[in-house]
Curated annotation (Swiss-Prot):
Highest taxon in the source lineage: Bacteria
Taxonomic lineage from the root: Bacteria, Bacillati, Cyanobacteriota, Cyanophyceae, Synechococcales
Subunit structure of this chain's protein: Homotetramer.
Reactions catalysed according to its record: a 2'-deoxyribonucleoside 5'-diphosphate + ATP = a 2'-deoxyribonucleoside 5'-triphosphate + ADP; a ribonucleoside 5'-diphosphate + ATP = a ribonucleoside 5'-triphosphate + ADP
PROSITE patterns in UniProt: NDPK, NDPK_LIKE
UniProt binding sites for ATP: K11, F59, R87, T93, R104, N114
Residues the record marks as active site: H117 (pros-phosphohistidine intermediate)
Signal peptide: none
Family label: Belongs to the NDK family.
Entry's EC annotation: 2.7.4.6
Swiss-Prot/TrEMBL cofactor(s): Mg(2+)
Protein name as annotated: Nucleoside diphosphate kinase
Length: 152
């Protein structure tokens, strides 16, 4: 069985405001498996590489400055449908458009401080996982309750 994985990053505002355990808990409760986790202050180069698709946009410089301004909690989550489910759990990019019950709908107000980043598709997830993690930082393990999470 191919395991779907996605990359998530709790941004400096989410770390500073103390939302790390709440956010991790939401994904654990949903039934996803955490296979990569680290906290770091991203270099400007890492931030530029991560947000390279926005390089020509007017907000690029501010985005790079913000993401490299403090600690980020980088994560790899695994599970069936994890990419789409994570996007739904995170909510709309603009927090004021995010539904209540989503991370951004519950915890964020401003688009420039929207708490969390999540991969938007399979190719992006692969790119971001490889950008932020070395292979030896990914822990491939089996949960003891996997038979209770989804039909095989």
């Amino acid at each position: 069985m191919i395991k779907e994985r996605t990359f998530l990053a709790i941004k400096p505002d989410g770390v500073q405001r103390g939302y790390v355990s709440d956010i991790i808990g939401r994904f654990e409760k949903k039934g996803f498996k955490l296979v990569g986790l680290k906290q770091l202050i991203p270099t400007k180069q890492l931030a530029q590489d991560h947000y390279g698709v926005h390089r020509e946009r007017p907000f690029f410089k501010d985005l790079v400055e913000f993401i490299s301004s403090g600690p980020v909690v980088a994560m790899i989550w695994e599970g069936e449908g994890v990419i789409l489910s994570a996007r739904k759990l995170i909510g709309a990019t603009k927090p004021l458009e995010a539904e209540p019950g989503t991370i951004r709908g519950d915890l964020a107000i401003d688009i420039g401080r929207n708490i969390i980043h999540g991969s938007d598709g399979e190719e992006t997830a692969k790119f971001e996982i490889n950008l932020w993690f070395n292979q030896d930082e990914i822990c491939d393990w089996e949960t003891s309750d996997s038979e209770w999470r989804a039909e095989n």
